[in-house]
Regions:
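Sec-dependent N-terminal signal peptides
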Residues: 4-13
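A short, N-terminal "cap"/entry segment at the start of jelly-roll beta-barrel domains
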Residues: 19-70
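Short histidine-centered beta-strand/loop micro-motifs
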Residues: 62-64, 83-88, 130-132
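Conserved short histidine dyad/triad with adjacent acidic residue
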Residues: 73-89
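Short beta-strand segments in beta-sandwich/barrel cores
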Residues: 82-84, 100-105
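Glycine- and acidic-residue-biased ligand/ion/polar-headgroup-sensing regions
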Residues: 91-92, 96-102
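Short acidic-glycine-tyrosine-enriched beta hairpin
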Residues: 109-123
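Ligand-binding loop in jelly-roll beta-barrel domains
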Residues: 123-147
Length: 147
């Protein structure tokens, strides 16, 4: 129950944060009603659509081409692995740990965190995430790519 509520709140917060950008100057959303339908606004997880990585896999719930560069991705990292080394990029990111333990890195420091923990990474700041545990690490990443 808590997981469902948290995920609904995350999704609602993320998608409504920029909702006004899709409204025309007259306040009309007619073009949106034809662009966004139940067929393309619902994404169910499927192992057939995962993207394998060296450390596990990723699943894109929302691709950057769907809505103005915003994405929602789930990453699954095998025990004692990291998707990549700490790095820097122009986009900020918001991580939300679903399952397992994570070690998160920000500006030279590591911290161990568990499920239902968020981790915000500002743009152009070195950051990273890895799985120090014996079980899979599963987390969501919300990111908005630059145009």
């Amino acid at each position: 129950m808590i997981r469902t509520v948290v995920l609904l709140l995350l999704g609602n917060l993320w998608f409504t944060a920029n909702a006004q950008s899709d409204v025309s100057p007259t306040g009309s959303t007619d073009s949106l009603s034809s662009k966004y339908t139940l067929e393309n606004c619902i994404t169910e997880f499927s192992m057939d659509k995962i993207v394998k990585t060296d450390a596990g896999y990723q699943f894109w719930f929302v691709d950057k081409d769907f809505i103005d560069g915003r994405t929602l991705k789930m990453s699954v990292v095998a025990p004692h692995q990291a998707t990549h080394a700490p790095h820097v990029h122009a986009e900020d990111e918001f991580f939300f740990i679903l399952e397992g333990r994570a070690e998160v890195f920000l500006q030279g420091e590591w911290k161990s965190v568990g499920p239902y923990t968020s981790f915000y990474c500002p743009s152009n700041v070195e950051h990273g995430i890895r799985n120090p545990g014996d079980k899979e690490l599963k987390y969501l990443v919300i990111k908005k790519y630059q145009k």
